[in-house]
Amino acid sequence: PTPSVEVPLVDFFCDPNGVRDEVNTLLVNKRRGYNAYFPMPFAKSGRIELVYDGPVEPGEELWRLMPCYSYVMYRTVDAMPEDCGYLHASWRQEALLLGARDYLALDAKGRGKFVGWNVTMRLPGRDGYPVDQNEKFYIDGESEASVEFQGIEDSFGFSWGFPPTESQFPLTGFYRFMKGAMGYRFFVQDAISFEKSLRVMIGFGVNEDPMFRREFSKRGNSMQLSSTVYWYQTEPHAPFPAMLSA
């Protein structure tokens, strides 16, 4: 069996480049330690692994450079609800011409609910980034998304672009990522449910100014996006994309 959660450590905790002193959200936070508060039900067993795949061999030198310890709080129950979903999280990263095709953040099969994500966006080697992409949620095989946010900043709680200063709130927030931006949002009371499948994509909407599609279809205008998506679903889950090696 494959893990239900497979994400780079810092991305899981809404700190994609790993340099922030502090992250404050309702479900994950960071300040001299990483903490997560997602409910993580399991019926028979649960296993959490932190995998290091860097160049330093295990031993005293690695411990000196990267000391690590952890604790997990859990409780056992006599039975779980039959329809109880399991926490899933998956990470993706891609550089692409958004004027030519959309970015795929999630392609889930099964029954469940989407509860949040964090997304980074940047134009490598350049200042600034477009914010006119829409976030599209195709539920149960839809050909047209029944949930679509207009403008990437709007779905993270802002409008007319991201603000000039970083903002952290319990469920939404934004901060700088290299020369681009990172936004997070958790859908606690407004989770997006699906019965058979959910496909989440980022791209220009059908009513977008054609100029944006032309501009971001040109060679050299590739946009780099990454995303960590959090959702609950019944098993089995569809295979995750392969993780990039360090």
Language-model features and meaning:
Residues 1-246:
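Beta-strand-centric surfaces of beta-sandwich/beta-rich domains
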